[in-house]
């Protein structure tokens, strides 16, 4: 079984499809390693039936997109699209099953709403900048990270944003309070997952009695204002804001980057929509989390390692070790375990026969 990103399908070398070359070489490894006596292989898709077969029974697919697995169609709460193929030795007369479509897609809210509500961490505040030797040097002040300070800062952001935009004016939201869980921790004792969670049986370990790796990172104060705007905007408009929406509200919401006004990163700050599968969790989440903003404005933060792990369908008892950056990398670089299990069952059936 081999996996790669969907972009592989459009890659070319000397006008030849890289994926076609890979399939050719995998079908006949001896053509690459001349001295080997390797068997030949039949290359199958795990989600589509072949369009036809060669005289020796090898499958033919008219479109390489037949090898793309869209994870959200197979019980994963994430729009993760990857090329995955299955090779079977040609002397084994077996046609593998394909993955079974889920009855319905699982949305983000369904798999993370039962994790404890926690606040964002406070790190530092941007003060000023100057150009030194042609490069911009930015200056920051450290910010005291405690519940009281956080509530004052985020409440002021919410008040300003709602007064200017009218977001949620008709809402009957209760007064914001600090979660008893604060910024969370590497282990938060709690009752999770709930039985209503669509992947309860997969996530749950009754011996765990809590959530691992559920701690928010420290954030730049200016970013928290952007997060508050983004989550309130999303809650009102059912879509996340583009940079032009930030600018329309207030120019001080634009990030201090040259590319802010180029349109190159129009979706740099992205709220994950609660009623849809999440976008692809990648290792880039380790950098700043701007592409993975929590939809709840009362938490005003990016996703934790455990929330990202839920999206990737890691069971709750899977503990990620090392620095938090490394933890995010481990989550983002993985094939979703729930998808891997389904693929493993197909392979297991082949081996049994």
Residue ranges, per PLM feature:
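Conserved Class I SAM-dependent methyltransferase catalytic core
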Residues: 1-73
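Conserved proline-anchored active-site loop of SAM-dependent methyltransferases
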Residues: 1-5, 85-89, 281, 332, ...
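Short catalytic/ligand-binding loop motif for oxyanion handling, primarily in non-cytosolic enzymes
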Residues: 7-12, 75-78, 93-96, 289-291
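A generic secondary-structure signal for well-formed alpha-helical elements
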Residues: 9-12, 22, 26-33, 89-92, ...
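A general structural signal for short secondary-structure junctions and capping/turn motifs
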Residues: 57-61, 73-78, 100-106, 114-120, ...
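Short linear interaction motifs
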Residues: 62-68, 95, 257-264
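Flexible, glycine-/basic-rich loop-and-beta segments that form/coincide
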Residues: 66-127
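C-terminal target-recognition/interaction regions appended to catalytic cores
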Residues: 130-353
């Amino acid at each position: 079984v081999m996996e790669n990103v969907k972009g592989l399908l459009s890659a070319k070398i000397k006008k030849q499809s890289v994926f076609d070359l890979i399939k050719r070489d995998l079908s006949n490894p001896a053509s690459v390693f001349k001295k080997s006596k390797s068997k030949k292989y039949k290359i199958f898709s795990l989600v589509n039936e072949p369009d036809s077969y060669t005289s020796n029974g090898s499958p033919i697919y008219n479109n390489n997109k037949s090898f793309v697995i869209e994870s959200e169609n197979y019980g994963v709460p994430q729009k993760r699209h990857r090329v995955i193929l299955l090779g079977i030795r040609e002397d084994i007369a077996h046609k593998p099953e394909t993955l079974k479509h889920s009855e319905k897609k699982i949305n983000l809210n369904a798999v993370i709403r039962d994790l404890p509500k926690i606040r964002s961490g406070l790190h530092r505040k941007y003060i000023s900048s100057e150009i030194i030797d042609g490069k911009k040097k930015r200056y920051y002040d450290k910010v005291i990270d405690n519940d009281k300070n956080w509530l004052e800062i985020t409440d002021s952001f919410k008040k300003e944003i709602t007064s200017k935009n009218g977001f949620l004016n008709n809402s009957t939201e209760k007064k914001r309070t600090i979660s008893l869980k604060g910024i969370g921790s590497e282990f938060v004792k709690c009752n999770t997952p709930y039985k209503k969670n669509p992947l309860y049986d997969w996530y749950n370990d009754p011996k765990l009695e809590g959530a691992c790796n559920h701690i928010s990172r420290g954030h730049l104060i200016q970013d928290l204002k952007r997060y508050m705007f983004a989550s309130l905007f999303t809650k009102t408009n059912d879509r996340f804001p583009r940079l032009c929406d930030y600018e329309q509200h207030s120019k001080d919401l634009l990030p201090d980057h040259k590319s802010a006004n180029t349109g190159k990163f129009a979706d740099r700050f992205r709220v994950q929509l609660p009623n849809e599968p999440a976008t692809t969790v990648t290792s880039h989440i380790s950098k700043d989390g701007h592409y993975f903003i929590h939809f709840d404005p009362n938490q005003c933060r990016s996703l934790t390692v455990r929330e990202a792990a839920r999206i990737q369908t890691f069971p709750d008892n899977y503990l990620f070790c090392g620095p938090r950056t490394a933890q995010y990398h481990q989550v983002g670089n993985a094939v979703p375990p729930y998808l891997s299990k389904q693929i493993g069952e197909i392979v297991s059936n082949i081996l049994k026969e």
